[in-house]
Amino acid sequence: MQQPIIGVGHSMGGCQIATLSVTSRRMFSTMILLDPAIGPPDMGLATLDLGQLTLRRRTQWPTREDAEKALRTSFSTWDSQVLNLLIKHSIHSDKQSIEMEDGPVSLVTGRYQELVNYIKPSFIRSGKVNGQELIHQTGPVDMYHMLGLVTCSALYLCGGESTLSVPRVRDLWLNRTAKLSYSKEPGETRKVDERIVPDTGHFLPMEEPKKCADIIADWIEKDKCIAWNCCVGKRGKTWCELSNASKEMSAEAWMKYLQSKL
């Protein structure tokens, strides 16, 4: 794929973008992780109450008006345009109310789809819905252990009031990310940094989309690693276009140079 490719992800999406940087080496020229769900074992999904919160979450309302009122209350800190989009696309009419002018509505995405992000659905393999060991998803902790293998520059964009990206965790991210020089090319540099959006929480891209967009644009504009990756791609294409004789001459010259270095 032609570079630059820039990875941007929020929460679990940030974890998945970072994982792609490791499993699909050199896919991204840079990535921006917004309050990513990446953390040490003591902050893994098993330590949070996300499963319980999901099961308690309401998913149905008598009318669309009731649903809209509930969502506006729950997400009152969100930017108005973002909240309007959420209301527009997250609610649908129940089957029995399609022919009615106003009837029961439900969330488009139910509890199950969210719950399996946190807890593994063991009943699928065992066929038993009870009596099974409770196994939480390990992706955020797995990615924490792989941070040293990240293959591109990374910006951690975090909410100042987020309980997920607390200072201790941010320090761990910065100290571990891309430190093992995995799949690194000669002359390549990888920049790792953080930016904080004050007075926002874990939902910072929904609360302050303009501020987040400005920070992301500034990072992309100033990240020299993006230009470096594009140049590498062009050099690689030029090499492929050389004749075999020219490639052999270059290889011989390189080996001669190495003799003076090794």
From Swiss-Prot:
It holds the Pfam family Abhydrolase_6. InterPro entries: AB_hydrolase_1, AB_hydrolase_fold. Disruption phenotype: Abolishes the production of AK-toxin and impairs the pathogenicity. Its EC number is 3.1.1.-. It comes from the Eukaryota. Disulfide bonds: none annotated. GO terms for molecular function: hydrolase activity. A motif (Peroxisomal targeting signal type 1) lies at residues 260-262. One of its GO terms (cellular component) is peroxisome. Keywords: Hydrolase, Peroxisome, Virulence. Pathway: Mycotoxin biosynthesis. It is found in: Peroxisome. The keyword Membrane does not apply. Belongs to the AB hydrolase superfamily. AKT2 hydrolase family. Gene clusters encoding host-selective toxins (HSTs) are localized on conditionally dispensable chromosomes (CDCs), also called supernumerary chromosomes, where they are present in multiple copies. The CDCs are not essential for saprophytic growth but controls host-selective pathogenicity. Abhydrolase domain-containing protein; part of the gene clusters that mediate the biosynthesis of the host-selective toxins (HSTs) AK-toxins responsible for Japanese pear black spot disease by the Japanese pear pathotype. AK-toxins are esters of 9,10-epoxy 8-hydroxy 9-methyldecatrienoic acid (EDA). On cellular level, AK-toxins affect plasma membrane of susceptible cells and cause a sudden increase in loss of K(+) after a few minutes of toxin treatment. This is Abhydrolase domain-containing protein AKT2. The gene is AKT2.
